[in-house]
């Protein structure tokens, strides 16, 4: 019996009936094309739809580059975005977590790809997410050259989704970080964070649960914002200010992105054996969100320091003779910079604290 001669109601199942709507996916692609084009840069044409994204490294102006790659996600911060129904900021977080890991190695981010997985595709939700990704790419100066949208019924609860990002950058071989001349007496600078960034949100969510507040409640630490809005403040992207400072003078020897694990886990990753970072904790202007989290959750200072950035999202190890130049270059790009300490001989721990954190 041909398909045309089958009795009504006896046609075969469709992919849409199984839970995957190809038309919704195509609609989303059409809606995000202008967002993708807004991330154009030398080396990328800003078009999507092919089987792979293209990038012309020569057009980007490098002579003898080393490619640097990073991938990351946003973690359980996504759960707050889902529950608060705010989806246009987590894309910035996704880009930030990847490109900040590139710039700490001295690399300029070139292009970015994303992975968006959900149980039931909502084109409007997807467009909101990609609008954030595009904004993050513009802030970082990298092109969004492709991605994957996966609709997987049965894998996620209704409304849930996950994100992953992939970034590739390049640096001239002689400008890679960390440098090999980090020495005792080098100065440690801290760049202010925009808030919690994208780490520690399992603890954040537990503290909010204990507080009895909801995502639509007034944020106790940020007048004029709901708790959801305040906690979803996007991760700061440090790429352009740091690249400007690196190019302005030869003063930056190492950079450390302060993510999960805080100071004690991230700073030692860029230090040579035998050296430790001495951090003056009272120098940190702790944002109110961290004081609220610490007090509401009864979290000890050392636990705060190994879970959150506590107000410092990026660390720079700087030649003492070039400190003023580096600070000036960063300040010119809008960064709030504080002198946090210095490099010292390592006896035991890779990070040594002086004083107390003002929580």
Curated annotation (Swiss-Prot):
Gene3D superfamilies: PurM-like C-terminal domain (3.90.650.10), PurM-like, N-terminal domain (3.30.1330.10). It catalyses: 2-formamido-N(1)-(5-O-phospho-beta-D-ribosyl)acetamidine + ATP = 5-amino-1-(5-phospho-beta-D-ribosyl)imidazole + ADP + phosphate + H(+). Pathway: Purine metabolism; IMP biosynthesis via de novo pathway; 5-amino-1-(5-phospho-D-ribosyl)imidazole from N(2)-formyl-N(1)-(5-phospho-D-ribosyl)glycinamide: step 2/2. One of its GO terms (biological process) is adenine biosynthetic process. One of its GO terms (cellular component) is cytosol. CDD domains: PurM. Keywords: ATP-binding, Cytoplasm, Ligase, Nucleotide-binding, Purine biosynthesis. Signal peptide: none annotated. The keyword ATP-binding applies. This is Phosphoribosylformylglycinamidine cyclo-ligase. It comes from Brucella melitensis biotype 2 (strain ATCC 23457). The gene is purM.
